[in-house]
Design a protein with these regions (language model features):
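Glycine-rich flavin
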Residues: 11-122, 323
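Short, charged, amphipathic alpha-helical segments
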Residues: 226-231, 256-264, 293-296
Length: 332
């Protein structure tokens, strides 16, 4: 309820700085302190992520990254982040952008370029994947306000999610500290829990789009729009059941390998999201696209956000896992 009330006070974000100000305000109110995955309240964590997504997907992108960074630092038993710090979590590894680290005493020196660093211009710290001298992946925490860090204006041309400022950052002899050991980022159980958290964000955006259609059908119950609403309800209801079940499984076995669970959940939520975009867009017509700024922004943002999935590549990975499962796993 506190989060819902807080978000009601914010309407519209002109740019990255406005998103950063809202994220800072959330942090100052303690609303960034989400239950950790596997703590027994994983569904509450997913619910809050979905709430922020339904409010504004661009703010959610920064909020999810900040809260994910806090969870990772806690999971890897590293020192608590500085009081009042705001974090970005950047783990994209396209072939053209790579950060290297080398040891310098108790700290690390960073060199290279990191792609798609959402909120880089407005966060105080970044948690990012880099590669050490033995070509092992290493998580590194970096203070952003130092001479060796340059936040560029390059790397993002999409209209959707533009205000997230997901630009490239260049590191030139920047200082950082290791978070965990090499390989820990992907090896920890929370990696897959975080992937389901992103799916909860997709869910929140899709749910908000569906509410626009529900409101329209309540005022004008036109048969074709009602058919679209029925399809949307079916998809959302199924997706909600999947997220609730996933949260329960994480809480029951927080240290278990959750890769299969995450791949299944993300595939389900992605499919639902695409169905909602399709049905809502066809049902509401041009009016909301042209006259409802929140709806128009969501319709621009959600297809971009959901592309954090790797589409058929992820489905192929899921199929490979399922092919190795014993028969009978689909029985009730």
């Amino acid at each position: 309820m506190a989060l819902h009330g807080f978000l009601r006070g914010y309407r519209g974000y002109a740019d990255t700085q406005a998103l950063g100000d809202a994220l800072k305000a959330l942090q100052e109110e303690g609303l960034d302190q989400l239950p950790l995955p596997g703590s027994g309240q994983t569904l509450e964590r997913f619910s809050r992520l979905a709430q922020v997504a339904g409010h504004d997907l661009r703010l959610c992108k920064l909020f999810e990254g900040h809260t994910d960074a806090l969870a990772i630092i806690k999971e890897l038993r590293c020192p608590l982040p500085p009081l009042g710090s705001i974090w970005g979590m950047w783990a994209a590894e396209p072939p053209y952008a790579k950060v290297r680290v080398r040891k310098a005493g108790q700290r690390l020196l960073l060199e290279g370029r990191k792609a798609w660093c959402s909120g880089a211009a407005v966060v105080s710290h970044g948690l990012l994947t880099a590669w050490d001298e033995e070509d092992r992946q290493q998580l590194v925490a970096v203070e952003m306000h130092q001479p060796g860090v340059t936040v560029t204006d390059q790397g993002w041309n999409a209209v959707g999610m533009a205000a997230t400022g997901s630009v490239e950052v260049v590191f030139n002899e920047a200082w950082g500290i290791a978070i965990g050991q090499p390989g820990d980022y992907l090896a920890r159980p929370g990696f897959w829990h975080g992937g389901i958290g992103i799916a909860a964000c997709w869910y929140g955006g899709a749910q908000r789009l569906a509410e626009v259609l529900r409101e329209q059908c309540g005022k004008r119950p036109e048969p074709h729009a009602l058919a679209h609403l029925g399809a949307v309800d079916s998809a959302l209801n199924s997706a909600a059941c999947v997220l609730r079940a996933s949260a329960g499984q994480i809480d029951q076995a927080p240290l278990a390998d959750a890769r299969l669970l995450a791949q299944q959940t993300r595939a389900s939520i992605e499919d639902m999201t695409e169905q909602v975009i399709h049905h809502v867009g066809r049902a509401v017509g041009a009016g909301p696209y042209c006259k409802d700024p929140h709806f128009a922004q969501l319709m621009a943002d959600l297809p971009v956000y959901v592309r954090q999935s790797h589409a058929e590549r992820d489905l192929a990975a899921l199929g490979e896992l399922v092919a190795g499962e014993p028969s009978g796993s689909w029985q009730l």
